[in-house]
Amino acid sequence: MKLIILDHYSQASEWAAKYIRNRIIQFNPGPDKYFTLGLPTGSTPLGCYKKLIEYYKNGDLSFKYVKTFNMDEYVGLPRDHPESYHSFMWNNFFKHIDIHPENTHILDGNAADLQAECDAFEEKIKAAGGIELFVGGIGPDGHIAFNEPGSSLVSRTRVKTLAMDTILANARFFDGDLAKVPTMALTVGVGTVMDAREVMILITGAHKAFALYKAIEEGVNHMWTVSAFQQHPRTVFVCDEDATLELKVKTVKYFKGLMLVHNKLVDPLYSIKEKEIEKSQSSKKPYSD
């Protein structure tokens, strides 16, 4: 497990974006080899998405051969509703990059058979070869996706009833009107995310400090579903200083002492421009008479 501690939200967002960029470029995706990326919604990943868009616009990164799978979607909310996760992803990320729409996968909360939709989503992940890197965020109660406290740590994609704390937290997106807030959602399971070859979890802000403490300093507990990722062989937690307020001083000191090593994951920062130059140079035949 790696814990990356940056000073501020913007730095944490940039580190995460650099990591995703390097992972995609090092994977060297192509027509017969897609990079599969799991993605979250919410305010936490917005800074990361903005940096990824910047990398694309600068010509340093392409999503042409990337397939994405989103974590969740509300049940009963029209796809074009401004607060649907379809709208969120298209407005904040997908429409700004070169990803093909057919390569984006978001659960359909209006499907006639919701469980069949969840089962099909799992099959699509398998057909894509599994998730290479699953990026996630958490709530103050430690839930990941909509795996609320008490969720099974081996759960799969399913229909989930939302906890009242989540409904109250989401009311701000629905004019503060609890009656407008969806009470159910489709969500990947903890087990679904655990199946990814690598997991990166973004945790920022003092309001999530206790959840981070539960995630890494205490034992695995289904009341704090994010704690399950202690047992994943390749978990990266990316956080800002505020999120570390509940951690022991020695824990923070230990992981900060590893930053010189961990920063090598994003430095050097790779670019598809460099890859294209290397490719063109290697394809040139030596001069001969």
UniProtKB/Swiss-Prot annotation:
A GO molecular function term, named singly, is: isomerase activity
Q: What class of enzyme is it?
A: hydrolase
Q: Name one GO cellular component term.
A: cytoplasm
| Catalytic residues in the record | 72 (proton acceptor), 141 (for ring-opening step), 143 (proton acceptor), 148 (for ring-opening step)
Note the InterPro entries from the entry: Glc/Gal-6P_isomerase (IPR006148), Glucosamine6P_isomerase (IPR004547), Glucosamine6P_isomerase_CS (IPR018321), NagB/RpiA_transferase-like (IPR037171)
- At what positions is N6-acetyllysine found? 64
GO BP term, example: N-acetylglucosamine catabolic process
What CDD domains does the database record attribute to this sequence? GlcN6P_deaminase
The family note in this entry says: Belongs to the glucosamine/galactosamine-6-phosphate isomerase family.
The entry's protein name is Glucosamine-6-phosphate deaminase 1
